[in-house]
Amino acid sequence: MSLPFDGAISKFHTDAAPQDVRDAIAEDPKGPILTDYPYDDRMKRSDYEDQLAALQIELVKLQAHVKATGTRIAVVFEGRDAAGKGGTIKRFRENLNPRVARVVALSKPSDKEASQWYFQRYIAHLPAGGEIALFDRSWYNRGVVEHVFGFCTPEQRAHFFTQVPEFEQMIVDEGITLVKLWLNVGRAEQLRRFLERERDPLKQWKLSWIDVEGLNRWDAYTAAIDETLSTSHSATAPWTVVRSDDKRRARLAAIRAVLAQVDYAGKDHAVVATPDPAICGGPEIWNA
């Protein structure tokens, strides 16, 4: 089976990736690459599975509370490409009722949507009473990817930054619990994951030309992310950053971060606990 995009990711790896990135991948091609991570080794599978099972029971309790009380929860999943957003969302909802917990993953705007107020197409997908909406990417496309690739003007982006605090304030004032998660991953581990996807026929669908083109724009992404997080972090709608080089630890931290936002009957505080502060915190840890 041929490689997607004519093997462009492999070509970047061999011809254009920084030497330290290539060295890290050569040293640990199966990963995860944890060179700058707070832990030297991936979390043991048995420990991960035990904690995940207990946390998924807590998510079921949360779902029952949401349905019974009409609570509305919106969780925004953002992050670097290949940071594990989709896998984390999967672990959130795999034991939940899809009528209660639904994923919102919008494609690029249509011509009609592009002519509307920027936030308009997202409003229709906010949760109704008794729903949890999981946004696999969100309105923050304008702050990062649209800026990096020139899909919006500087004026449009500046207008977005002016409006996003007010938009999120309205969401919260309406009674919706808003949780914003930023999943981050190091450059070597990101490229290793891309190479893995490129070679695996079952994962190739995850790749896009944005992923390929973005490989050469790491620094531009870094600057855009830094500005976006610092500008849109607020007491009303704070960012929770999860360092996701170890997917197992990251998934557990993300689930705990959401469960911490809602009180529900039968909550097991020993299980929910506090997200691991070594990998989960505010914007100050995003590029640590």
Where are these regions (language model features)?
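Glycine-rich phosphate-binding loop of ATP-dependent small-molecule kinases
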Residues: 1-288
